[in-house]
Amino acid sequence: MRLTPHEQDRLLISYAAELARRRRARGLRLNHPEAVAVITDHLLEGARDGRTVAELMVSGRSVLTRDDVMDGVPEMLHDVQVEATFPDGTKLVTVHQPIA
C-alpha cells in the first residue's frame, strides 16, 4: 500500500490519538502531543462526518478538560489548527484555547 505524505500524516494523527485515548481510559493524564492528537483527530473525523467549521470550532473546546491532561498543558496549548477535508473542499479549522 502506498500512501501520500498527506495520508501518512493523517494516519499518524489517527494512531497517536487512539493511543492517547487508550492511555486516558487507563486513567493517565495526557501530555501535550497526545492532547493535540486527540483534538486534531476529533476535528478531522468531524469534518469527514459532514459537520461545519463552526460546529467543530465549538466542539473542539470540549474534547478534553484540565483533568484529562498533565499540569501545564492547557497553558502551552493556545490553538489547534488543522486543514480538514469537508464535503465541499478543504478548510482550515482553528480551535482557540481548546482545553477549558
From Swiss-Prot:
Similarity section: Belongs to the urease gamma subunit family.
Broad class of enzyme this protein falls into: hydrolase
Taxonomic lineage of the native organism: Bacteria, Bacillati, Actinomycetota, Actinomycetes, Mycobacteriales
One biological process term in Gene Ontology: urea catabolic process
Keyword Membrane set for record: no
Coarse class of the protein's main subcellular location: cytoplasm
Name of this chain's protein: Urease subunit gamma
Keyword terms, alphabetized: Cytoplasm, Hydrolase
Enzyme Commission number(s) of this protein: 3.5.1.5
Gene Ontology CC annotations of this record: cytoplasm
Pfam families: Urease_gamma
Organism, scientific name: Mycolicibacterium smegmatis (strain ATCC 700084 / mc(2)155)
Localization: Cytoplasm
Signal sequence coordinates: none
SUPFAM superfamilies for this protein: Urease, gamma-subunit
Biochemical pathway: Nitrogen metabolism; urea degradation; CO(2) and NH(3) from urea (urease route): step 1/1
Catalytic reaction annotation: urea + 2 H2O + H(+) = hydrogencarbonate + 2 NH4(+)
MF terms in GO: nickel cation binding; urease activity
Keyword Hydrolase on entry: yes
Subunit structure: Heterotrimer of UreA (gamma), UreB (beta) and UreC (alpha) subunits. Three heterotrimers associate to form the active enzyme.
